[in-house]
């Protein structure tokens, strides 16, 4: 927890720009088919009301993953304050085999102790499966809740939790001198802050694999340019500003390279920069348009969008040479892919029958599953553990962010109150 807090501390420098008009998760479709679990409100050991609903944060995180269906608080058979008070039979009668309980205690120095216990109410009734405690200041209470969620999630699924991650996105606000803003928030929309404001459009933010930098497209020089901004100090490095289009940046998983699309020779083509030396090499060529690169885990292969066959489809190419290979065959067109960190699947924008939705493709079998049901879906970005996707869609006259689990069980919106929201990018583990 202490190391995780040190990593996250760099963001505090930017929190002077925290906004009041934040995005928040609004549930559209529940997870009745998820694993039932009990999450009890954490016991508050101080005066008045608790400063944060940690139990609510844990329940929301588990629900958002699509893998769990936390029991509504009104249906909880009991509200134990500790593992010893859990009555396994009361929970197992409701089909629940695991319960999360916890405690929040104020300290004289103004900090708080947050503790949780994950209790087995099925196979080995009363056994504590996982537990931990954290000492945090008030502004880190939500982070402590997400930490508990990560640990509970991993214990029960074997998958590393991704609830302490963040998302970057672009907001086009309703007027003002700087109507375009690149913002970052917790994955669930809380603790939002501004990274960069501009009078000109901002596009396509992409995280470095260590979470310390964002690459994005800006038009402040009068034409498109690719820049990399360090979040801790705001330092900006210009990467590319060639004639015509400069766009679609993507850091390699090993952090050594940046892929992007340029049209300096006419058609859009893919290029890769070695970030240490600044040297750029061309990966694709020809008259077709090639863009929207995303890396495979080996940092040697890219998936990308090309109109080589007429309509946009997703292809794979090795950055060291070789002919591109088409990897999407279902639907009239497929584009803007994001490959999972294990390389087993990708999500993409898939169009068929006049509909444009987010779909998931198994890269071994080629099987495709449509995940979303919103309108004109765009720019999907995977959580680092591959369980959730953030994307933008059209709603009314604007754009909003949406969340869908990669098993399709859970769907939610993250509506903003002060503008259109586009180009979401999910951070790595932080």
From Swiss-Prot:
Keywords attached to this entry: Cell cycle, Cell division, Periplasm, Signal
InterPro entries: 6-blade_b-propeller_TolB-like, PD40, Tol-Pal_TolB, TolB_N
Principal cellular location given in the protein's record: periplasm
Signal peptide per UniProt: 1-21
GO BP field: cell division; protein import
PANTHER family (UniProt xref): PROTEIN TOLB (PTHR36842:SF1), PROTEIN TOLB HOMOLOG (PTHR36842)
Function, as annotated: Part of the Tol-Pal system, which plays a role in outer membrane invagination during cell division and is important for maintaining outer membrane integrity. TolB occupies a key intermediary position in the Tol-Pal system because it communicates directly with both membrane-embedded components, Pal in the outer membrane and TolA in the inner membrane.
Family: Belongs to the TolB family.
Protein name listed in UniProt: Tol-Pal system protein TolB
Species annotation: Shigella flexneri
Lineage: Bacteria, Pseudomonadati, Pseudomonadota, Gammaproteobacteria, Enterobacterales
Gene from which this protein is expressed: tolB
